[in-house]
């Protein structure tokens, strides 16, 4: 069952919580393959560190891969689809990336961070969480909680 509520709270939008499988069974254990796509190295690193800390606190040990360009990200996604992805690109580039990711990986869990309010597009694309930049650590962590729902 999908809960398709749109709730605004400062720069935070809860879009969709789905029960789609967001893990892959490898060798008898669950593996999260999480892709982080962002233009700025500091931003990619910050999201990757927050994801790793959050998952480790839950007893999960994800494979987090960072990408700085969409072409490499989508080539990798076609070969080995991520279970989860964070898209943090500015403007229409973020919208295009979110649309392309959804077409390639229909069940991939997605957190989308943008400087423009694409919350309705994020809802249409079944993003789990949409955040307007600047994104606080607390707001991002709430997005990560939706991945465990």
Residue ranges and their predicted role:
Residues 1-35, 45-48:
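Non-catalytic signal-transmission and effector/linker regions of two-component phosphorelay proteins
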Residues 38:
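Conserved acidic carboxylate
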Residues 41-65:
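Two-component/phosphorelay signaling modules centered on CheY-like receiver
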Residues 67-84:
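Acidic, metal-coordinating helix/loop segments flanking the phosphotransfer/catalytic sites
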Residues 83-148:
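CheY-like receiver
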């Amino acid at each position: 069952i999908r809960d398709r509520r749109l709730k605004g709270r400062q720069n935070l939008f809860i879009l969709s919580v789905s029960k789609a499988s967001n893990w892959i069974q490898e060798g008898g254990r669950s593996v999260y393959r999480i892709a982080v796509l962002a233009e700025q190295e500091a931003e990619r690193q910050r999201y990757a560190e927050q994801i790793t800390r959050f998952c480790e606190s839950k007893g999960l040990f994800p494979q987090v891969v960072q990408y700085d360009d969409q072409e490499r990200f989508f080539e990798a996604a076609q070969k080995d689809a991520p279970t989860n992805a964070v898209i943090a690109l500015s403007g229409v580039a973020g919208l295009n990336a979110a649309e392309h990711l959804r077409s390639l990986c229909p069940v991939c869990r997605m957190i989308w961070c943008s400087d423009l309010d694409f919350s309705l597009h994020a809802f249409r694309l079944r993003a789990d969480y949409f955040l307007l930049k600047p994104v606080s650590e607390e707001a991002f962590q709430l997005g990560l909680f939706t991945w465990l729902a």
